[in-house]
Swiss-Prot record:
It is found in: Cytoplasm; Nucleus. Its EC number is 3.4.22.-. This is NEDD8-specific protease 2. Residues 1-42, 320-415 are annotated as: Disordered. The lineage of its organism: Eukaryota, Fungi, Dikarya, Ascomycota, Taphrinomycotina. The keyword Ion transport does not apply. One of its GO terms (molecular function) is deNEDDylase activity. The gene is nep2. One of its GO terms (cellular component) is cytoplasm. The active site is at residues 171, 188, 229. InterPro entries: Nep1/2-like (IPR044613), Papain-like_cys_pep_sf (IPR038765), Peptidase_C48_C (IPR003653). It comes from the Eukaryota. Protease that catalyzes two essential functions in the NEDD8 pathway: processing of full-length NEDD8 to its mature form and deconjugation of NEDD8 from targeted proteins such as the pcu1, pcu2 and pcu4 cullins and other proteins. Has a role in meiosis. The modification Phosphoserine is found at residues 35, 367. Keywords: Cytoplasm, Hydrolase, Meiosis, Nucleus, Phosphoprotein, Protease, Thiol protease. It comes from Schizosaccharomyces pombe (strain 972 / ATCC 24843) (Fission yeast).
Amino acid sequence: MRSNSIFTKEIDSEAVKKSSNLRPPSTGSSNSNGSDTASPKKKKKGFFRSLFGSSSSGSKSCGSPFTRIWLEYFEVSLRKNDVDHFRPGYWILDTNIDFFYEIMLRQVLLKRPKEESQQIYLLRPAMVFFLAQAPNPLEIESALPPAMFDASFIFLPINDTNECGIESGSHWSLLVVSVEKGLGWYYDSMSNGNTNDCNLAIKNLGILLKKEFRVRHMKTPQQINDCDCGLHVCENTRILMYRLLQKPYVPKVDMNLDHSVVDSVRLRKALMEVITSLLAAYGSKVPKPSETHTDPEKDKKIFSKICKTEELLELPTLSAVTSDSAQPHSLPASMPSSQPQSRSESLPLTHPNSEPNPKLDSQPNSSPVRRPSLIKVKTASTSVLPTSILQRPPSIVPRPETAAIQHTQQSIEIH
């Protein structure tokens, strides 16, 4: 949950430096001002413990394994403490979300055509914090990434911290903004979470983009503990990003997550396996200093459990739209899942296939207008998930007191 390492980042901007103090590396402790108490540092024997050493206790000097960099993945550096927070029972830090977002950027967005990848921007937690807390957002405009201003959809991980220089923040939630529609979809795995911080972020974003936004609270799977909210943000980001990448080819994109499943245990395990696989394949720096890119075949194997690279490569591109005589196909609203051994080990996937648009399908094939939805796509045979997987398991059904205050939201249609 916590955002313990936001201020360890170096941001070359006078506006940012004036608005905050740089923060020392996190000690891994959690000391909330709210009702949550620190999650126990669980020790787990096995491969991961032998790889990363002992549990985070004792002295943490400057040269200790807890502060030195264990893995550099492009623009994100993970220390021992950051890696520990992927283990069960730990709050997710902003660095953990950075790592997940970097994977989505490198393994998903940048492998799509440029005209598609530029439509989606994953804003990092540190930038979201500065945006939400800035008294005058125009003063930090130069510190924000230029690509954000050209995107159609912006993903903002929201943290409820409003303090600089100390460990703070106790909850993560997700805000997805459609710039064209002037609309934000808010996903909170605790229905009584940080609405105020969501409003601050979208208000300042509207000032920067010179646009008024309205926010819709979406039905979202509820977490069953106090430490998985950051994983919900990561998984919800992946699901929604995959759906939005299908936007040129399907008549409607469903932004609801009420039927989705977030398997936090499996996601934590998958991310730890990614880290160990990267270390084994590339060493502590990815890519290596002598290289500018990574090996696609290695990456396909390393990231297959998180982003299903092979499924992405089968998605059509704008140039793949064939003649008007092509038959329409609906793309899967989420990635196909391999047959799980048990529900606890199944990758959290959601949503059945989108329904075809009868108005488009009923039009004659001889129409001179090319419609992106009329394409020939080879879909995977496993694209339709079993009904048992699509149904929400009892373990994530919200408690009565949280379910009573959830806002009912209809599907959002995006053209």
